[in-house]
C-alpha cells in the first residue's frame, strides 16, 4: 500500500510542480501591444498545427490499438493508447507553455535590461516541458505496473502465455511493450511533423530573406518569420519533449522486458524436473527496480529545477544551468546507490543473470551510462561549438566559397562519428561487464534518469530564441536582443549534452531491445534448454546478412525521404515569400505587413501530409519482412538498422550543428574583414541551410526509427517465428 502511494506521489508532485510553474509564468506581464500581437500569431499558429497533428495521430493510434488487442492481448492495446495519451499530453502542455513564456522573457529583458530575470522566466517556462515529460511518462508507467502488473497479476505470473492465435509471450513484457510503442508513435509523428515544419520555414526564411533580400534574422518584413518562430515551438519543444519521453520510457521498458524473460529462460532441467535458477521474487524485484530508479531521478530533477527558480536571479546563465543539471545528476547518483543496495541486497540468483558484484552491480552500469552520456555530449559540443577548432576551421573555409563549406562540413561530420562511437563501445562493454544485458538497459536509464532537468534546459533554448525573434519583430532596444541571444547561445551549448544523452541512450536501449527480441522468441518447448542454444542468431545465415543489408539501406531511404519532405515544403515557402515581396507594395520598405498566415498554412499543410509515411516505414518494415522471411531475417534487419542508423544520426547531427555555428562564428565578428552580407557569410548561410534538415529532422528521427522497429519486432516476433512465407 505504501509502495503504491509512493509510486503515485512522485509523478503527481512533478505534474503539480509543472502546473505551478505554468501559472507563475502566465501571471507575468506580456509587454507592449505589438509584443502581444506578435506572440498571438506564434501561439495561434502552434496551437492550430498541434490540434490538426493530434487528430491525425490518434486516428492511426486507435487502429494500431485494435490490432494489438486482436493479435496479442487487450491489455497491450490499452497500454498502447495510454502511452500515446501520456506522450501527447506532455507535448501539448509543454508547447502551450513555450508559446506563452516567449513574450514574457522578452518583456523581462526589456524592462530590467538584465540577463537574470529573463533567464528565470525562460527556465521556468522550459521546466514545464521537462516536468511534464518526467511526470506523464512515469504516471502512465506506474498505472500500467499497478493495474496490469499487480492488480491483474501479470507480474506474479511470469510463465510463457499462449494466446488464441498460438502466440507465445510473457504477458507483462507484452503489456509494457505496448506502452512503449504508444510513446514511440507519438514521438515519431511529433519529430517528423515538427521537424518538417520548423526546418522548411527556417530554410525558406534564410534562402530568400538573408541571401536574396538581405534581411536580418527575424526581420518583420520577412513573411516566413512567424512560421519560423512557430516551428521552434513545434519542433524544438513539443518534438524534443516527445523524443526524450520516448527514450526515457524505452530505457525503462527494455529493462523490464529483459527481467520478465529471465524467469522462463534461466531454467535447468534436472531429470524430469524443471528448476528455476532465478527465484520469482528476484525477477519481480528486477522488474520494479528500474521504475523506482526513474522515480528517484525524477525527485532529484525537481530539486535541481527548484534551485534556479527560487534562487536570486544571476547574470551567469551558463553557471545556473550547469548547477541545475549537475545537482540533479549528483543527487541521482548518490540516492540510487542507496536504493540499489537496499532494494536488491537480499535477492538470490543475481550471479546467474550476470551481476558481477552482487546487488550493487546495476548501479555501476547506471554510472557508466551517465558518464558515457556526458562524454558523448562533450564530443558533440567539441565538433559543433565555435569555441573549438573544427567549427572555426569550417567557418574560415567559407572564404574559399560554398563548395569548401559543404565539403568540410561533411568531412567534420564523418570524423565526428568515431569518438562517440568508441565511447558507446566502451560503455556497452563495461555496463555488460557489471550486470550483463540487464546492466546495458540500466545504463540507458542512467543516462536519462534526470531527464526532467535535461528537457527543461533543452526547452529553455527555443523559448529564449523565440523571445529574441519577438524583440526583433517589435523593434525593441538592441540590448534586449543581445540578452536573448546570450540566453539562446547558452542553451545551445548545454543542449549539446542533451543530444549526447539522447543519442547514447537510444543506442543502449536499442541493444537492450534487441536482446529482448531474442528473449521474446522463446516458446514453452524451449524451457529447460541452455540459454546459449535458445538465444542464438547465426551470423553465417544468409538471411541474417541479407536482413542486415536491408536494415542499413532503410536508414538511408528514411533519411532521404525526410530531407525531400523538408525541401519540398521549403520550395513552396520560397515561392510564397518571393510572391509577397513582388506583389505587396511597400513590404520591403516596412510600410506594409506581410501575410504571415499564408506561410504558416503552407508549412503546416505540408508537415501534416509528410509525417505519416516515415511512421509506417518504422512499423511495417519488421512486420512485412518478418511475415515474408521469418525471425532470423528481422534479427538481421535490426542489426543493420541500429549500426547504420546510429552512425548516420551522429553524422547528421554534428554536420548540421557545425554548419549552423560556423555561420554564427562569422556573425560574431571573428572573421576579420567579413561580416553579414559578405560572400563568405552567404556561403555559410547556404551551409546552414543544408544542415537544417540534417540536425533537426533526420538525426533525431533516426533515433526513434531504431526504437520503433525494435519494439514492433519484440511484440510481433513470436508470430512470425512460426508464421512466415519463405
From Swiss-Prot:
Its cofactor is Mg(2+). The record marks 191, 236, 243, 696, 707 as: Important for ion transport. Mg(2+) 1 binds at residues 202, 206. GO terms for cellular component: membrane; plasma membrane. The keyword Magnesium applies. Inhibited by GdCl3. Requires K(+) for maximal activity. K(+) greatly stimulates Na(+) binding. Thermostability depends on the binding of Mg(2+). NCBIfam families: PRK00733.2-2, PRK00733.3-5, V_PPase. Has 16 transmembrane helices and a cytoplasmic domain that contains the active site. Pyrophosphate binding is thought to trigger a conformation change that allows Na(+) release. Has at least two binding sites for Na(+). Belongs to the H(+)-translocating pyrophosphatase (TC 3.A.10) family. K(+)-stimulated subfamily. This is K(+)-stimulated pyrophosphate-energized sodium pump. One of its GO terms (biological process) is sodium ion transmembrane transport. Mg(2+) 2 binds at residues 229, 232, 465. Homodimer. Ca(2+) binds at residues 660, 688, 692. Residues 23-46, 98-122, 198-235, 310-320, 380-405, 464-492, 572-601, 659-697 are cytoplasmic. Substrate binds at residues 199, 695. The lineage of its organism: Bacteria, Thermotogati, Thermotogota, Thermotogae, Thermotogales. Residues 1, 72-73, 154-168, 262-284, 344-358, 431-436, 521-541, 630, 723-726 are periplasmic. Pfam families: H_PPase. It is found in: Cell inner membrane. It is an enzyme of class 7 (translocase). Its main location: membrane.
Amino acid at each position: 500500500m505504501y509502495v503504491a502511494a509512493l509510486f503515485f506521489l512522485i509523478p503527481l508532485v512533478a505534474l503539480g510542480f509543472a502546473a505551478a510553474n505554468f501559472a507563475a509564468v502566465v501571471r507575468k506581464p506580456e509587454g507592449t501591444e505589438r509584443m502581444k500581437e506578435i506572440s498571438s500569431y506564434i501561439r495561434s499558429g502552434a496551437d492550430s498545427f498541434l490540434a490538426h497533428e493530434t487528430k491525425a495521430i490518434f486516428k492511426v493510434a486507435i487502429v494500431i490499438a485494435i490490432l494489438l488487442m486482436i493479435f496479442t492481448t487487450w491489455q497491450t492495446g490499452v497500454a498502447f493508447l495510454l502511452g500515446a495519451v501520456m506522450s501527447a499530453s506532455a507535448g501539448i502542455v509543454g508547447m502551450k507553455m513555450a508559446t506563452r513564456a516567449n513574450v514574457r522573457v522578452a518583456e523581462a529583458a526589456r524592462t530590467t535590461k538584465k540577463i537574470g530575470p529573463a533567464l528565470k522566466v525562460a527556465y521556468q517556462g522550459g521546466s514545464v516541458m521537462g516536468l511534464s515529460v518526467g511526470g506523464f511518462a512515469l504516471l502512465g508507467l506506474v498505472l500500467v505496473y499497478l493495474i496490469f502488473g499487480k492488480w491483474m497479476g501479470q507480474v506474479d505470473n511470469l510463465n510463457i502465455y499462449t494466446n488464441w492465435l498460438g502466440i507465445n509471450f510473457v504477458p507483462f513484457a507484452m503489456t509494457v511493450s505496448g506502452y512503449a510503442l504508444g510513446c514511440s508513435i507519438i514521438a515519431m509523428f511529433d519529430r517528423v511533423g515538427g521537424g518538417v515544419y520548423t526546418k522548411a520555414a527556417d530554410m525558406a526564411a534564410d534562402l530568400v530573406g538573408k541571401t536574396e533580400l538581405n534581411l536580418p534574422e527575424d526581420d518583420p518584413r520577412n513573411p516566413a518569420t512567424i512560421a519560423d518562430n512557430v516551428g521552434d515551438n513545434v519542433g524544438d519543444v513539443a518534438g524534443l519533449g516527445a523524443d526524450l519521453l520516448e527514450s526515457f520510457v524505452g530505457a525503462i521498458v527494455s529493462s523490464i522486458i529483459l527481467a520478465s524473460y529471465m524467469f522462463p529462460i534461466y531454467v535447468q532441467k534436472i531429470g524430469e524436473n524443471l528448476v528455476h535458477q532465478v527465484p520469482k521474487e528476484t525477477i519481480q524485484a528486477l522488474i520494479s527496480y528500474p521504475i523506482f530508479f526513474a522515480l528517484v531521478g525524477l525527485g532529484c530533477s525537481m530539486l535541481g529545477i527548484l534551485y534556479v527558480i527560487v534562487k536570486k536571479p544571476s547574470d551567469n546563465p551558463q553557471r545556473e544551468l550547469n548547477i541545475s543539471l549537475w545537482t540533479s545528476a549528483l543527487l541521482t547518483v548518490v540516492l540510487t546507490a542507496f536504493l540499489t543496495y537496499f532494494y536488491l541486497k537480499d535477492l538470490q540468483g543475481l550471479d546467474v543473470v550476470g551481476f558481477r558484484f552482487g546487488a550493487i552491480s546495476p548501479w555501476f552500469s547506471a554510472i557508466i551510462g551517465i558518464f558515457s552520456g556526458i562524454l558523448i555530449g562533450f564530443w558533440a559540443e567539441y565538433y559543433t561549438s565555435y569555441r573549438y577548432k573544427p567549427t572555426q576551421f569550417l567557418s574560415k573555409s567559407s572564404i574559399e566559397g560554398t563548395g569548401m563549406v559543404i565539403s568540410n562540413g561533411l568531412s567534420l561530420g564523418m570524423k565526428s562519428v568515431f569518438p562517440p562511437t568508441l565511447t558507446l563501445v566502451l560503455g556497452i562493454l563495461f555496463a555488460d561487464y557489471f550486470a550483463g544485458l540487464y546492466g546495458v538497459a540500466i545504463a540507458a536509464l542512467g543516462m536519462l534518469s534526470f531527464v526532467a532537468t535535461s528537457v527543461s534546459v533543452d526547452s529553455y533554448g527555443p523559448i529564449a530564441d523565440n523571445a529574441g525573434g519577438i524583440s526583433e519583430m517589435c523593434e525593441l532596444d538592441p540590448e534586449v536582443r543581445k540578452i536573448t541571444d546570450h540566453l539562446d547561445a547558452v542553451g545551445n551549448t548545454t543542449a549539446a549534452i542533451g543530444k549526447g544523452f539522447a543519442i547514447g541512450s537510444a543506442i543502449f536501449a536499442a541493444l537492450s531491445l534487441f536482446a529482448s527480441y531474442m528473449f521474446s522468441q522463446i516458446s514453452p518447448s524451449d524451457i529447460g534448454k541452455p540459454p546459449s542454444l535458445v538465444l542464438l542468431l547465426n551470423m553465417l545465415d544468409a538471411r541474417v546478412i541479407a536482413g542486415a543489408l536491408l536494415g542499413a539501406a532503410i536508414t538511408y531511404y528514411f533519411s532521404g525521404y525526410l530531407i525531400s519532405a523538408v525541401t519540398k515544403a521549403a520550395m513552396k515557402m520560397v515561392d510564397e515569400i518571393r510572391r509577397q515581396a513582388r506583389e505587396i507594395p511597400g513590404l520591403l520598405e516596412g510600410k506594409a505587413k506581410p501575410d504571415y498566415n499564408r506561410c504558416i498554412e503552407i508549412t503546416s499543410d505540408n508537415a501534416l501530409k509528410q509525417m505519416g509515411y516515415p511512421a509506417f516505414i518504422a512499423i511495417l518494415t519488421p512486420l512485412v519482412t518478418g511475415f515474408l522471411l521469418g525471425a532470423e531475417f528481422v534479427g538481421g534487419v535490426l542489426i543493420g538498422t541500429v549500426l547504420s542508423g546510429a552512425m548516420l544520426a551522429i553524422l547528421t547531427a554534428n554536420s548540421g550543428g557545425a554548419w549552423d555555428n560556423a555561420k554564427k562564428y562569422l556573425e560574431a565578428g571573428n572573421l576579420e574583414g567579413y561580416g553579414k552580407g559578405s560572400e563568405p557569410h552567404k556561403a555559410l548561410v547556404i551551409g546552414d541551410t543544408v544542415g537544417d534538415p540534417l540536425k533537426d529532422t533526420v538525426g533525431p528521427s533516426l533515433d526513434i526509427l531504431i526504437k520503433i522497429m525494435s519494439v514492433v519486432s519484440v511484440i510481433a516476433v513470436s508470430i512470425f517465428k512460426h508464421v512466415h512465407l519463405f
